[in-house]
Amino acid sequence: MKRELLLEKIDELKEIMPWYVLEYYQSKLSVPYSFTTLYEYLKEYRRFLEWLLDSGVANCHHIAEIELSVLENLTKKDMEAFILYLRERPLLNANTRQNGVSQTTINRTLSALSSLFKYLTEEVENADGEPYFYRNVMKKVSTKKKKETLASRAENIKQKLFLGNETIEFLEYIDCEYQNKLSKRALAFFNKNKERDLAIIALLLASGVRLSEAVNLDLKDINLNVMVIDVTRKGGKRDSVNVASFAKPYLANYLDIRKNRYKAENQDIALFLSEYRGVPNRIDASSVEKMVAKYSQDFKVRVTPHKLRHTLATRLYDATKSQVLVSHQLGHASTQVTDLYTHIVNDEQKNALDKL
């Protein structure tokens, strides 16, 4: 979603929110949470607050009128009723006969609510230096995680990774072969953004940064001489990330054409730009997701930018056998989340041995 449209939608949601949600929003901007994250959270709050009205838990007409005391006095049974509502409500405008949202969506909703309740009961201060209330019902609500072993997850994921030579082959396919099947109109659009698209995909494959970290890069954040980028990690922490050398020519080619191709001025600080009606803007995450899906589906299998992050992590672990190094590269505080890559690499090694 374009940044301007995203901000418009955020403003629309803010207009209907209670004052304490607006305070939460303002507080998280300073962390900083991304606008995309805050937009998703606001949508979850609207859904929850509307349910409070519809179910009669809150006795008012508009969600902006819901008092803090309603949240303070929510019971575990109330939250269980809300979760049941999510599980059973019909899906609207969906190409499915299934009722209810997925467990992943429910977990995301509960995570957003946990963040709000933690703010209200622990982080915010009233005039006396105390939180607005102390009773946090979300601490009594447990989430149900998808049951899947690491081995099973590794097996599912590795089919969507570009391991070994496929990393370079994917980039070369976009560079040299993808255009051969395009119409004249599609070819013109491809040629306009070819260097940028290759630079973004090469960077994701060569650094393992998150999509949000990549699109939020500014021109000053990249140093091609030492192949390092400075990113803002989750929680607002700044980090320097090494970039594999194979991405250098793609990044250099893009930087050579960036100013003239996208009509960039000094005030256009974003590294990766798009252009609409002659005006350059920071490229948005949605555009990158669609771009990665388009190229990857034509090459091998449709993947997300996050699978490119998995690809880098798996290749790095395969080369170093160091979970610590991989966790540092990905910006994780713990090596626990890198266990997945050991399973993927071990499976690859077993397959190689079976061919001997």
UniProtKB/Swiss-Prot annotation:
One of its GO terms (biological process) is chromosome segregation. Residues 169-354 form the Tyr recombinase domain. Disulfide bonds: none annotated. It is found in: Cytoplasm. FtsK is required for recombination. One of its GO terms (molecular function) is tyrosine-based site-specific recombinase activity. Keywords: Cell cycle, Cell division, Chromosome partition, Cytoplasm, DNA integration, DNA recombination, DNA-binding. The active site is at residues 210, 234, 306, 309, 332, 341. Residues 16-121 form the Core-binding (CB) domain. SUPFAM superfamilies: DNA breaking-rejoining enzymes. CDD domains: DNA_BRE_C. It comes from the Bacteria. GO terms for cellular component: cytoplasm. Coiled coil: none annotated. The keyword Coiled coil does not apply. Gene3D superfamilies: 1.10.150.130, Intergrase catalytic core. The keyword Ribonucleoprotein does not apply. HAMAP family: Recomb_XerS. Belongs to the 'phage' integrase family. XerS subfamily. NCBIfam families: PRK05084.1. PANTHER family: PHAGE INTEGRASE-RELATED (PTHR30349), TYROSINE RECOMBINASE XERC (PTHR30349:SF77). Site-specific tyrosine recombinase, which acts by catalyzing the cutting and rejoining of the recombining DNA molecules. Essential to convert dimers of the bacterial chromosome into monomers to permit their segregation at cell division. This is Tyrosine recombinase XerS.
